[in-house]
Design a protein with these regions (language model features):
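C-terminal transmembrane helical hairpin of 12-TM major facilitator-type secondary transporters
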Residues: 261-302
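Hydrophobic core of transmembrane alpha-helices in multi-pass small-molecule transporters
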Residues: 98-118, 285-303
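Helix-turn-helix DNA-binding segment
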Residues: 385-412
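Pair of pore-lining "gating" transmembrane helices in MFS-fold secondary transporters
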Residues: 2-48, 194-220, 291-295
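Intracellular juxtamembrane helix-capping segments at the cytosolic ends
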Residues: 112-127, 298-316
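Transmembrane alpha-helices of Major Facilitator/SLC transporters
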Residues: 51-63, 144, 234-259, 329-338
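Intracellular loop-helix junctions on the cytosolic face of multi-pass helical membrane proteins
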Residues: 1, 129-133, 145-210
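A late C-terminal transmembrane helix in Major Facilitator Superfamily
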Residues: 315-346
C-alpha cells in the first residue's frame, strides 16, 4: 500500500484537502471567538450556522461557473478570491461590530465553498474510483484538524491567526490550480467499467441521508458550541484530537472490503450518536456526549465527502456533485440552527427524545435505499462468467466420456 498510496500526486491532493479543512474549521473557530465579543452564546451559534450555510452558495456556484468561465477569467477569479479572503479574515479578527463581523464571515464562507468544491472535484477526477479514496479523505481531514490544534495551542493572537489562515488559503488555491484537469473526468473509463445501477437515485438518497444525519450531528454540535461560547469548555483543545483520530479510523474502516461495509458502519455510528443525545437529555454526562460527538463527527464528514466524490464521476456535471456532501451538510445546519438551539435550551427531554428517535428511523430507511441504489453491476458479469466456466467444464466432461444428449440431460 505504501508504494501505491504515498505518491506525489496523491500527497498534493491530500495537502489541498487538508488545507481546506484547516481553513474551513480554523476560520469557524476564529469567527466564534470574535463573535462572542458581540453577542451571547446563543447568538454565536446562530451566527455560526448562518456563515456555514452561506458556504452552500459557494459549493453550488462552482458547479455552475466552472464550465462557463474562460481560463483567464478563472485565474483572475482565483487571485481575487485570495485577496478578498484576506480582507474578510482581517475584518473578522477586528470584530468592529456584529454586522461587519457577520458580513465578513458570510463572504468568506462563500469563497471557501467555491474552493472546497474545486478541491473535491480535483480529488474526484483522479481518485474517485481508487481503492483508497476514504483513506485519502480521512488522512486529509485528520491533518487539517491537527494543524488547527497546533494553531490553537501555539498562536494566541487573533491577528496572527488571520494571517496564517490567509496564507493557508493562498496555498490551497495554488495547489488546486496546479492540479488542473482538462475537460471531463480523466478517469471516466473507470466509472464506465464499474457502473452504478441507479446513480441519480443513489445521489438523491445520499443527499437525503446526509440531510437527516445532519439534524443529529448539528444538534450535538450546537450543544457543544453553546458550552464553548459560554466558557464552560474550549473545543479547540483535546477534543479536536479525538476528531482527527476518528477521521483516520473512519477512512481505514470505510475502505475495508472495498467499501462494502461503509454504509453499515455509518449506520452504527449514527445509532451511537442518537443514544448519546438521549443520554445527555436524560441528565447523563456531558463529557460523554462531547467524546461521542467528536468520535462520530469524523466518521460523518468522511462518509459524505467520500460518497459524493465517488458519485461525481457518474454525473453529467461532476463539478456540481463532488462537494455536494459538504453543501447539504452546511445548508441543513443553517435550516435547523435556531430550532435546535431552542430545543436544547427548552430542556424538554420528551420532545428531544421523540425527534431523535424519529430521525433515526428515517435515517435507517434512507441508508437502506441508498445502499440498494448505489450497488454496482459487477456481480452479474462474475456470475455469468462462473456459469460459463461450469458449462465449459461439463462440455469437456461429456466429450471425454462420449455422453449422449440423453445422458447429458440426466446429469444436468
Amino acid at each position: 500500500m505504501k508504494n501505491i498510496f504515498w505518491k506525489r500526486e496523491r500527497i498534493e491532493i491530500m495537502t489541498a484537502l487538508a488545507l481546506f479543512n484547516y481553513v474551513f474549521l480554523g476560520a469557524e473557530y476564529l469567527f466564534d471567538n470574535m463573535m462572542a465579543f458581540q453577542t451571547d452564546s446563543g447568538g454565536v451559534v446562530l451566527a455560526q450556522s448562518y456563515v456555514l450555510g452561506s458556504s452552500t452558495v459557494g459549493f453550488l456556484l462552482f458547479g455552475v461557473l466552472d464550465g462557463k468561465m474562460r481560463e483567464r477569467a478563472k485565474k483572475a477569479g482565483s487571485a481575487g478570491a485570495g485577496v478578498l479572503a484576506a480582507v474578510c479574515l482581517w475584518m473578522i479578527q477586528v470584530h468592529q461590530s456584529y454586522g461587519s463581523t457577520l458580513a465578513a464571515g458570510l463572504i468568506l464562507y462563500v469563497l471557501l465553498g467555491i474552493a472546497g468544491s474545486l478541491v473535491h472535484y480535483r480529488a474526484a477526477c483522479r481518485y474517485g474510483m481508487e481503492e483508497h479514496l476514504a483513506e485519502t479523505v480521512g488522512v486529509s481531514y485528520a491533518i487539517g484538524l491537527f494543524l488547527q490544534f497546533l494553531e490553537n495551542n501555539l498562536i494566541h493572537n487573533a491577528a496572527v491567526e488571520a494571517v496564517i489562515l490567509t496564507v493557508a488559503f493562498w496555498a490551497l488555491l495554488f495547489l488546486v490550480e496546479k492540479r488542473k484537469v482538462a475537460g471531463s473526468l480523466m478517469e471516466r473509463n473507470l466509472y464506465e467499467s464499474d457502473p452504478i445501477r441507479h446513480p441519480y437515485a443513489a445521489a438523491v438518497t445520499l443527499i437525503f441521508t446526509v440531510a437527516l444525519m445532519t439534524c443529529i450531528f448539528a444538534t450535538l454540535d450546537n450543544a457543544v458550541t453553546l458550552g464553548h461560547a459560554g466558557g464552560s469548555m474550549d473545543i479547540g483543545q483535546w477534543p479536536r484530537l479525538i476528531l482527527a483520530v476518528s477521521g483516520l479510523v473512519s477512512g481505514v474502516l470505510f475502505d475495508y472490503g472495498k467499501g462494502r461495509y461503509r454504509n453499515l458502519i455509518m449506520y452504527c455510528v449514527t445509532l451511537l450518536s442518537t443514544v448519546c443525545i438521549l443520554v445527555i437529555v436524560s441528565g447523563g454526562s456531558f463529557l460523554l456526549g462531547l467524546i461521542v460527538f467528536y468520535l462520530s463527527a469524523g466518521f460523518f464528514v468522511v462518509f459524505f465527502s467520500t460518497g459524493c466524490v465517488r458519485l461525481a464521476g457518474y454525473m453529467r456535471v461532476p463539478q456540481f456533485w463532488a462537494g455536494m456532501g459538504r453543501a447539504v451538510n452546511n445548508l441543513c445546519a443553517i435550516l435547523i440552527g435556531s430550532f435546535s438551539v431552542a430545543l436544547i435550551r427548552s430542556g424538554d427531554s420528551t420532545k428531544i427524545m421523540i425527534a431523535s428517535i424519529g430521525l433515526f428511523v428515517l435515517i435507517s430507511i434512507a441508508i437502506y435505499i441508498y445502499t440498494v441504489m448505489g450497488q454496482t453491476e459487477v456481480e452479474l458479469p462474475d456470475q455469468e462468467r462462473k456459469q460459463k466456466e461450469e458449462q465449459d467444464y461439463f462440455s469437456a466432461f461429456a466429450d471425454t466420456y462420449a455422453l449422449t444428449e440423453r445422458e447429458q440431460e440426466v446429469l444436468k
